[in-house]
Amino acid sequence: MKTNRSLVVIVSLITATLLLTACAQPEQSSLAGDWLLTPKDKTRGLTGSIAVNIAPFRCKTNCRGDNLPDNTRRWQLSGGNEKELTYLHNMSAQEKVGLNPGWQCYTSFFMRVCQGKPGTRPIVNEDYVSESGFFGSMMHVGIIELRRCQSENCQQELKAINTH
């Protein structure tokens, strides 16, 4: 049981920053709501889905020492007892070259989150197709598909996954 909890904590912390950077304007709320995160690269050792809630957030003062002015737009990701805040960094020109048309990504620290048309390939020279139109990637985790939940707190989706 401790291994499963550790996995959930690791995945939620790794993906927290990743997920929260998908849109330049948190108020547009394209990421706001309940999401199911599923690592797609089974060879990297992380399996299983976790449920998270993403909400816009504005830090007023003492904003975690992130060297940004107070009141900078951020996302807050909550999963279980974990909460994480993040902010945006635009991706480099070299990173943009690797994307197919219609996809836009943002990086935060060493991760990125991308948004585009569902059912299309976001990355040039990659076979991965995003089912939902949202995905994240990180060097040590690989690709994580983001899927919007239909039930409150993703409970029905998690139950269906855990029974298979």
UniProtKB/Swiss-Prot annotation:
The keyword Cell membrane applies. One of its GO terms (cellular component) is plasma membrane. It is a lipid-anchor. Residues 1-22 form the signal peptide. A lipid is attached at residue 23 (S-diacylglycerol cysteine). Keywords: Cell membrane, Lipoprotein, Membrane, Palmitate, Signal. The keyword Lipoprotein applies. It comes from the Bacteria. A lipid is attached at residue 23 (N-palmitoyl cysteine). This is Uncharacterized lipoprotein YbfP.
